Regions:
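Polytopic alpha-helical membrane proteins, predominantly small-molecule transporters/carriers
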Residues: 1-283
Length: 283
């Protein structure tokens, strides 16, 4: 359980760092780029992927490149959502991206749906709608629309990443290989984009990005390790991770960033947690 707790804490610390960094004048895109630099190195050292025997012709490079483009884009949307919608709503939306992944598994991979899984998906979608509509109550119309857009982007974006990862692994590539390659491509593409934009490089963004990458990778590594150690209890890992991230996100939003828990947000939170429990029971 300590691994799940630590993984969830690292996940929320990523969001807290991004939110604080923006307020202190850091460049989110530079941070995201350097985050993938350290994540690539750590992924190679931790998971030890067999990159030497990759088949150049058989590897779906287009998928790796797409993932390399999507990852930093979604990370940037996450940073924007944290600023406009807040950490509380953003963490819930990110965690509930799993319901879209499950719907994709049903339609694309012919995965069977039980009544519990269907209930979890329905509750999850309803929860996200509550979060989006609760954003409509903001007095700032422009901030309001941006918050709704970025919340939706986070929800859909993380689901797309999950779907692409599942599809890539279904083609026979090992997860450590995919993870390392997509981190490398995400770093390269992010750096190229920043050079094209003639970005003013600052050492503080590099340092913050490396810290971001350390937390981001720790979240992934600890979560994978928890699944390995608790391989006979995947529901505990799934439910524990998602519920703890949501709860930590709520606590951070309320006590660190002084966000308000509106009625619709509270309803979304309750429905989201209920959805996670249903999905965990369905595993």
């Amino acid at each position: 359980m300590e691994l799940i707790f630590s993984a969830a804490l690292c996940s929320v610390l990523v969001s807290i760092l991004l939110k604080f960094a923006k307020n202190k004048g850091f460049d989110a895109l530079q941070m995201i780029a350097w985050n993938y630099a350290i994540a690539s190195i750590l992924s190679y050292l931790w998971f030890k992927p067999d990159l030497a025997h990759i088949s150049v012709s058989a590897t779906p490079w287009w998928l790796i490149i797409v993932l390399g483009m999507v990852l930093p884009s979604i990370f940037l949307c996450l940073a924007k959502s944290l600023q406009t919608a807040g950490i509380l709503k953003t963490e819930i939306a990110q965690r509930l991206s799993v319901v879209l992944s499950l719907l994709a598994a049903y339609f694309l991979f012919q995965e069977q749906f039980s009544q519990l899984k269907m209930a979890g998906v329905t509750l999850g979608i309803t929860a996200v709608l509550c979060l989006i509509f609760s954003q409509a109550g903001s007095s700032n119309t422009n901030l309001n629309r941006k918050g709704m857009l970025f919340l939706l982007s986070v929800w859909v974006g993380y689901a797309i990443v999950d779907i692409l990862l599942k599809y890539t692994t279904s083609l026979g590539l090992q997860f450590p290989v995919i993870l390392t390659l997509m981190f490398i491509f995400a770093f390269i593409l992010s750096i190229v984009y920043l050079f094209i934009q003639k970005t003013q490089w600052k050492i503080k963004n590099v340092i913050a990005g490396l810290l971001l990458g350390l937390l981001n990778f720790a979240n992934i590594a600890l979560y994978v390790k928890a699944h390995i150690l608790l391989k006979d209890s995947p529901a505990i890992v799934f439910a524990g991770m998602n519920i703890l991230v949501v709860l930590f996100g709520v606590l951070a939003g309320l006590f660190i960033f002084k966000e308000k828990l509106k009625k619709m947000t509270t309803l979304g939170l309750v429905l989201g947690l209920a959805g996670v429990v249903c999905l965990a029971l369905a595993i």
